[in-house]
Amino acid sequence: MGWDDFKRRNWLFKDLDLRTQAFVPGDEIKRFPLYEGLPTVEKSRGELQYVAAVELIQEANIDDIFIGDSRASIKQLRYIHYFQQNGVMNIECHLLKKYQTLYDQKFEIRKDIPEKIVRLTCPRTPGIAIEHALNRRKGSIVMQNKLAQRYSGEIDIVKQDLPFEARSNVIGWVTPEYVNLLNYIDDQTKIIFRKID
């Protein structure tokens, strides 16, 4: 089913007070005969099931998610359930050794959401040294350094490729399979950085 038509129909169902449901592909054993997954929406095929589920919940107003294949990993099921119950996104990433204390912490999102970055609400730290000031690729996790003055210590996630900025230290990267989650973060979302297995 096409994405735009699917969203339109779901909003009509919601207007009638009906629950909406959709399938996402499994991540371990795919169904015969194509072994490509069995999602409701073609757009979800090839996506990590957790990312596909978040997209369906956020963009198409889906109430219930089903796995369209024989098997799914417990980790992915936990991520989906936790997002549905708590509005918290688990984002797998790699953080530089110095910043690994950021793993498994819950962060809120600032209410003023720019188009190009996600700004986390966390205490700012003055005097952060200038290091790893690199081009900021989509999915980069950055911390503002002392050149950012009062914003020193602020943590952001880059939503689209941005040029080098001397006041931004790249401290980690979102795993490529999870980068599309950045499109669905709003001011109500909370996130947790998870270490890659």
Write out the residue ranges for each language-model feature.
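Catalytic alpha/beta core domains of metabolic enzymes, predominantly
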Residues: 1-96
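C-terminal functional modules
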Residues: 94-197
